[in-house]
Amino acid sequence: MFRSITQRVIRNNCYKQSTKSITSSTSFINNSLSYTTTSNENDIKDKNEEHDHRAKGKGRELLLSFDKSGLAQFPKQVFKNRKYPITDFEKYLQDITKVRGPMSIDTFIKEVLTNPKYGYYMNKDVFGKGGDFITAPEVSQLFGEMIGIWCVATWEAMGKPKKLQIVEMGPGRGTLMKDILRSTKVFKEFYDSISVHLVEASPANKKTQKQNLLYFKDKAINFDHKTIGETPNGIKVTWVGKLEEVPTDIPTLFLAQEFFDALPIHVFRFSREKNDWCEVLVDEDITEHGEYYLRFVQSKGPTLMTTAVKHLLPEFGLDGYQVELGLAGLAISQQIANRIDKSGGAALIIDYGYDKIVKSSLQAIRDHEFVDILDKPGTADLSVWVDFQTIRKTVKLLKNKSTAIGPVDQGIFLKEMGIEHRLAQIGRKLDSNEKFEELVMGYKKLVDPKEMGTNYKVITICDKNITPIGFSTSKTYDDEDLMI
């Protein structure tokens, strides 16, 4: 399900700066303007000399002459093997590297996914059959209904607080929240206690979410950098751009379904020559044989980031050993844990990933197919496989009232939440075999180990005094050694 990062090293710097003393002379003759720039050398007819004649009307001529022999020459064969003409976004990314030098993969992912003008998520609906990929809520209503059951059961385990926030991070098209609100309205006491916050950066996604969730689709109001609306059943929905804008003094259930996989990462590679960790970066590619306009390179030595996270990296010296570290995801995990410690609640993180540190999983998907990461950036989704082990250990490092439990396979979690019972319940009410077969197909895709059942995993962050719902099969981890 993933493709390794293409490793391209060695940068050819063709932008060496050299200057040569240039003098200029100007002369005005008979209403004719002639501007001439020459070198100190007498022979301005050298083969490196260029002339640009531009008519400015009868009797007017602009003459430019300059010697380029002292300037660095751009390779004549550059870009000749490229698969397509360079895009405006690629020019923009190249300009960044020219000014600042190679960028971290963290910065590259941020630009590709959330750049206001070119970002993949910012200007179109990318979910569902008409988009580039399908997420679990789009597969079947059963998924959202099981998450709704988890919300109600966890609220009860918390002691049924009178006020409860449900916060979804990266809510996609709003399908998951729509199914949760539809399926839980039979639990009146729970329903009367809830409000919803959606953490969304994409204007295009926010528009789709409003259409799916609100009673008055175009009547949501903007207040204090937030957008506020109401569902047909009277549930208040607030859109914010980041988690920090969500109130911290109310018990909260946090939902992150395929959210962490889209967060930026840093990639580190051990160099035996340097006997230290280096960082994998993205640079412009101006070589003759490169397929794309960007390429991956390795830093010449430790960077500021490798120094900052060195205590998190393994201490062994296999040359070329590579590690992905999602610092943004770890920071959000700790932020959620601190909120739960302060005000109570729980979090459910669902994503594809491993219960171990990840080496090389960055991937790009366009039109439901994997493509090269550097192929027309901004037109394909970038994602990584989530490192659940590091999330769990990072939360436990806080040593407060919160803890992390899991992960468990998605298929096992959904079965423990009662998906099979719900499948049978709905199946008895369907009036055609086609509808029943469609329902069963969705169920199988969610729980089958060959589909999403095993690759997708679930982890919870919760108060230590709460017995987490859906995690009875979770392993007991010896995390005394919290070294990642």
Curated annotation (Swiss-Prot):
Keyword Mitochondrion: yes
Chief location category: mitochondrion
Family matches, as InterPro entries: NDUFAF7, NDUFAF7_sf, SAM-dependent_MTases_sf
Keywords assigned: Methyltransferase, Mitochondrion, Transferase, Transit peptide
Compartments, as annotated in UniProt: Mitochondrion
Record-level GO BP terms: ATP metabolic process; culmination involved in sorocarp development; glutamate metabolic process; glycogen metabolic process; methylation; mitochondrial respiratory chain complex I assembly; negative regulation of autophagy; phagocytosis
Known catalytic reactions: L-arginyl-[protein] + 2 S-adenosyl-L-methionine = N(omega),N(omega)'-dimethyl-L-arginyl-[protein] + 2 S-adenosyl-L-homocysteine + 2 H(+)
GO cellular component terms given for this protein: mitochondrion
Disruption phenotype: Cells show pleiotropic defects. Cell size, growth rate, phagocytosis and macropinocytosis are affected. During development, cells show an enhanced tendency to remain at the slug stage, and spore viability are compromised.
Span of the transit peptide along the chain: 1-12
One Gene Ontology term of the molecular function aspect: protein-arginine omega-N symmetric methyltransferase activity
Keyword Mitochondrion: yes
Assembly notes: Homodimer. Interacts with ndufs2.
Function: Involved in the assembly or stability of mitochondrial NADH:ubiquinone oxidoreductase complex (complex I). Acts as an arginine methyltransferase and probably acts by mediating arginine methylation of ndufs2.
Family: Belongs to the NDUFAF7 family.
Protein name: Protein arginine methyltransferase NDUFAF7 homolog, mitochondrial
Provenance organism: Dictyostelium discoideum (Social amoeba)
Gene: midA
